[in-house]
Regions:
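Bacterial lipoprotein signal-peptidase II cleavage site
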Residues: 19-28, 35-37
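Ser/Thr/Gly/Pro-rich low-complexity, disordered linker/stalk segments of secreted
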Residues: 36-57
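Extracellular LysM carbohydrate-binding repeats and other cell-envelope/extracellular binding modules
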Residues: 76-101, 122-172
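Core segments of small alpha/beta cavity-forming domains
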Residues: 175-277
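C-terminal motif of bacterial Sec signal peptides marking the signal peptidase cleavage site
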Residues: 14-17
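Positively charged n-region of N-terminal signal peptides that target proteins for export
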Residues: 1-9
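Exposed beta-sheet edge and beta->alpha loop/turn motif
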Residues: 279-352
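Primarily a LysM-type cell-wall glycan-binding module
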Residues: 61-64, 69, 86-122
Length: 352
């Protein structure tokens, strides 16, 4: 039986680097259905002026195939299967909004950071959010949920590919497999890298934190609980490091392994020291969509993950007969950076 060794309040702090939207309550995610999606509509851009585009700084690399990327990982990688491209499908009790949604930011430390992330200006953010100072104080020194444009935002219905990621050696059946939608216009290697990031973070660095099973060890630093044993995703730190660097940018990996308190650390004899904990999810989560990935002047690829939430006071959970219609989209930018060995994910926030 897996031990819950940390109080939820501590766990939420430990998972902050890997977490997604703020946790309101714990609820099962509604099951997607095969209901047809509405026809795509033109997606208006935010009305603000875009910030200055970055100067080209990254080298140009030849495309790396999915098979070559997986073979060169330097560790045992999961198995993958890819669906055909398809339109996004709503959850069983969700209806796509017909009249657009309120577009909001995720989180930023400063207005300048928010303006750069969301391609707008500080002046526009202040105009759209007259309570921005209260927002900063209320959220303990950060900006959350700033409005990005005055008019309703029409959701894009860009095609996605469903990627199933499976690690058959993992002991916990729930952690063994996951299926995640990614933009269909990414190449296969980029699709696999992004789906793997979702898989890793949902299973061990987001909804749950840390590998299991593990052997408890006393007197470890901070919230580390023991070292991963057979049946865990990885048991050797060298393999785990190769996995991380094969999926994520070096900068993201450095942040993960050097954060305080640490969720993972290298132990003696190439072992993996691991934490252990869980967090809740947002009961009003209604799914997520993507904008179309765009190549940036610096060589990276960027797009938005649009996290759909129902903020209406009339929302009373998922037990009613009427479908739930999301009214807000939280924008979480995703960036893939090129390397000689293929695309790497420069961090991704879980949509829920």
């Amino acid at each position: 039986m897996k031990k819950k060794l940390l109080a939820l309040s501590l766990v939420l702090a430990m998972l902050s680097a890997c977490a997604s939207t703020p946790s309101d309550s714990i609820a099962a995610t509604p099951t997607p259905t095969e209901a047809p999606a509405p026809a795509a509509e033109p997606t208006p851009e935010p009305t603000s002026n875009p910030s200055q585009t970055p100067a080209p700084t990254m080298a140009v690399y030849d495309e790396v195939s999915f098979d070559d990327w997986r073979a060169a990982a330097g560790c045992t990688m999961p198995d993958y299967s890819f669906s055909a491209p398809h339109t996004p499908q709503p959850f069983e009790k969700v209806a796509w909004p017909a009249e657009g949604v309120t577009l909001r930011t995720y989180v930023a430390d400063t207005l300048e950071e928010a303006a750069e992330l969301y391609h707008t200006t500080v002046e526009t953010l202040k105009e759209l959010n007259p309570d921005y100072e209260e927002n900063y104080t209320r959220n303990h020194g950060q900006y959350w949920g700033l409005k990005l444009q005055a008019e309703p935002y029409t959701l894009p219905m860009n095609n996605v590919v469903s990627v199933t990621v499976s690690a058959p050696w993992v002991e916990n059946q729930y952690d063994r497999t996951g299926t995640y939608n990614v933009p269909a216009s990414l190449d296969k290697q980029a699709q696999a890298a992004l789906a793997t990031a979702y898989y890793f973070q949902y299973k061990w660095c987001g909804m749950h934190g840390g590998f299991w099973p593990y052997e408890p060890v006393d007197d470890l630093p901070k919230w580390l609980q023991g070292y991963a044993t057979d049946g865990a995703f990885y048991t050797k730190f060298s393999e785990f490091s190769s996995f991380l660097h094969g999926v994520y940018s070096d900068a993201w990996v450095d942040d993960l392994l050097n954060e305080e308190p640490a969720l993972f650390a290298e132990g003696e004899n190439d072992t993996i020291l691991t934490g252990d904990g869980d967090r809740g999810s947002n009961v009003a989560y209604c799914g997520h969509l993507f904008t179309e990935p765009e190549l940036q002047p610096d060589g990276s690829v960027e797009f938005w993950q649009l996290v759909l939430i129902c903020e209406s006071e009339e929302f009373a959970g998922w037990g009613g007969e009427e479908p739930v219609v999301p009214d807000t989209a939280t924008v979480m930018p995703i960036r893939l950076v090129p390397t000689e060995d293929g695309w790497r994910v420069n961090g991704v926030n879980l949509p829920n």
